Amino acid sequence: DDCIVVEYYIVTDSRFTQRFDSDQAVTDYVTVMFTGVQNLIETLNLDIKVRLLGVTPYHKESEPSFIDDSLLPGHETYVDARKIVRNMKFYFCNHNTGLAKSADIIILLITRKMGVLDPGDTDISEIAGASSISSVCQRCNNVGACVDNSDHNERADTVAHESVHLLGSPHDGEGPNGLGLPNSPGAANCPDSDGYIMGTRNEQNGKKFSECTKQCVKYLLSLPRASCVYENCSK
């Protein structure tokens, strides 16, 4: 019998790493965070397990240039959400070895703010995460970035949120357009105001996923392109 196991490789930018006394402390923190991610993913009721393959904390001297290359010009306290995903794809496509090669999803944790600045706009739209939609298992595309600038594990919800984008779900209230999955049910029938993780996250529903999200993830997992998350249960 097959089990669904989504395997993650986590990298942390040097500013994130600096918050900790050692690389082991970074790994310990992320390990606890992933207990939270597992608890949230379980609300999909799809028997999905998350597995942390490993953590690489970048330091100033070892940090790949794609992070600094992704800052918003003129607003260097912000990472450009679109650019960081694009640059991550390029970097890990060219460094597709070790844990990066083994992982179903690669996530970068950063402490800088992340935002989107559209042409002609002066106000930055601040966001907590960005990822490549429906791209689990797709080498060179299976990436996301999440902001974690607190000492608490509340960012498990951001990692879970971006994971579910990578697993084929839009935000609640959005149709399937843009998912790259022609027959996906989308999530237009679940208003974002219901307050689930892919919506406005209210007190009542903010720690679980909507039925629409569940159906979207279930659909992607039924396709051959998601085969990397299936493994023999005895492993």
From Swiss-Prot:
Record keywords, A-Z: Calcium, Disulfide bond, Glycoprotein, Hydrolase, Metal-binding, Metalloprotease, Protease, Secreted, Toxin, Zinc
E.C. number: 3.4.24.-
Residue ranges of domain Peptidase M12B in the record: 4-232
Disulfide bonds: 137-228
Tissue expression per record: Expressed by the venom gland.
MF terms (GO), sorted A to Z: metal ion binding; metalloendopeptidase activity; toxin activity
Cofactor binding note: Binds 1 zinc ion per subunit.
Keyword Zinc: yes
Entry keyword annotation includes Transmembrane helix: no
Activity regulation, per record: Inhibited by EDTA.
GO biological process, one term: membrane protein ectodomain proteolysis
Broad class of the protein's primary localization: secreted
UniProt-annotated location(s): Secreted
GO CC annotation terms, alphabetical: extracellular region
Top-level taxon in the UniProt lineage: Eukaryota
Pfam families for this protein: Reprolysin_5
Alphabetized SUPFAM superfamilies for the sequence: Metalloproteases ('zincins'), catalytic domain
UniProt family annotation: Belongs to the venom metalloproteinase (M12B) family.
Full protein name: Venom metalloproteinase antarease-like TpachMP_B
Originating species: Tityus pachyurus
